[in-house]
UniProtKB/Swiss-Prot annotation:
SUPFAM superfamilies, alphabetized: F-box domain (SSF81383)
Swiss-Prot/TrEMBL keywords: Membrane, Transmembrane, Transmembrane helix
Compartments it resides in: Membrane
Ranges where the record places region Disordered: 1-21, 81-127
Keyword Transmembrane among UniProt keywords: yes
Keyword Transferase: no
GO cellular component, one term: SCF ubiquitin ligase complex
Protein name: Transmembrane protein 183
Bilayer disposition of the protein: Single-pass membrane protein
Highest taxon of source: Eukaryota
Family the UniProt entry places it in: Belongs to the TMEM183 family.
Transmembrane segments annotated in the record for this chain: 300-320
Length: 376
């Protein structure tokens, strides 16, 4: 009996069906070690269909060992057949790939949990608000602050800084250190401290008369500084005067005074500008001599000095005089400031040479010997 064409004696061969568009192929590790060829083995395969990503290490090792065995090389010290039989089994490769997947997943989970924990910690820090105490508490605490600790106290918080701007704070500080036997100028006496204008500057000046730690600082200044002061560079000369000093010497000495105002550095942004006190305390913080200092040079004889008021002080040197017994001071003034790295020739600018020099002193605006106006 003849059979029809649809009934074959042998089994039908397996047919490979192409996947639909958009469905990803499963790339199994044992496929690389078998004789089956898939679309993923070709370089021009569709990336939308073929699974993207790197080849797992277990699959790469199996392929490498099979290639070595086909080329007649040994994958390791064991024969190629043993290597293929031991490593090429699908179950072992799947187990190793599963272990690597588990390790990768655990690593990702740890990194994600660490990021969440750091983010939660940052949110806790941002949301943590401290206690805000009233202004009276800070004013009470300020009564126990030493004069040298005022800056540290004002940096605690904004309310503490605001307290240091008030007239009550500076008045209490003055009364706490005032003594009846204190030798003070007329402007720094108690009857003159009732004025609010320049109150802060006057209290600071009085502390250098009454407060022992501050008075000890200025008493250690030598007649000739050990090193040339560098803080006066690019300062503007506001005033100049000289006076005759009659002392124990047979011949009088001459005192030359230069009043300078230090130039504030250029600020790149307005956020870096100096912190201004509240408007109601502007008079308390007013100081006409802010950033000013006085250079006082005493010579053994009179020396003619050119007009330097309004000019910029650029160079200051102190050397040994020609007689090897005194000092020689050289001052150089320019019409404009000297920027960093700019070198000037020796003949440029207006030069003032004082020789022989008896003493050189530099007084800041709070120094007791600094001449300040009684109207301040």
């Amino acid at each position: 009996m003849a059979r029809g064409p649809g009934q074959l004696s042998g089994p039908r061969p397996d047919t490979v069906t192409m996947p639909k568009r958009g469905k990803r192929l499963k790339f199994r590790a044992h496929d690389a070690c078998s004789g089956r060829v898939t679309v993923a083995d070709y370089a021009n395969s569709d990336p939308a269909v073929v699974r993207s990503g790197r080849v797992k290490k277990a699959v790469a090792n199996a392929v490498q060992q099979e290639v070595k065995s086909l080329c007649g090389l040994e994958a390791s010290q064991v024969p190629a057949e043993e290597a293929l039989s031991g490593v090429g089994e699908p179950s072992d490769i799947l187990d190793s790939s599963d272990e690597m997947d588990a390790q990768e997943e655990s690593t990702q989970e740890r990194s994600v949990s660490r990021k969440k924990k750091s983010k939660r910690h940052k949110e806790d820090l941002d949301g943590a608000g401290g206690e805000e105490y009233p202004m009276d508490i800070w004013l009470l605490l300020a009564s126990y602050i030493r004069p040298e600790d005022i800056v540290n106290f004002s940096l605690i918080c904004k309310n503490a800084w605001t307290v240091t701007c008030t007239a009550a704070f500076w008045t209490r500080l003055y009364r706490r250190h005032y003594t009846l036997d204190a030798s003070l100028p007329l402007r720094l006496r108690p009857e003159s401290m009732e004025k609010l204008r320049c109150l802060r500057a006057c209290v600071i000046r009085s502390l250098y008369h009454m407060y022992e730690p501050f008075a000890a600082r200025i008493s250690k200044n030598p007649a000739i500084p050990e090193s040339t002061p560098s803080t006066l560079k690019n300062s503007k000369c506001l005033l100049f005067w000289c006076r005759k000093i009659v002392g124990n010497r047979q011949e009088p000495m001459w005192e030359f005074n230069f009043k300078f105002k230090k130039q504030s550095p250029r600020l790149k942004s307005k956020c870096m500008e100096r912190l201004q006190p509240p408007i109601q305390y502007q008079d308390v913080h007013t100081n006409p001599d802010q950033d000013c200092c006085l250079l006082q040079v005493t010579t053994l004889n009179f020396i003619f000095i050119p007009i330097v008021m309004g000019m910029i002080f650029t160079l200051f040197t102190i050397n040994v005089s020609t007689d090897m017994r005194h000092h020689r001071v050289r001052l150089v003034f320019q019409d404009s400031p000297v920027r960093g790295g700019q070198h000037l020739r020796s003949e440029q600018g207006v030069q003032v040479v004082l020789d022989p020099v008896h003493s050189v002193r530099l007084f800041d605006w709070w120094h007791p010997q600094y001449p300040f106006s009684l109207r301040a």
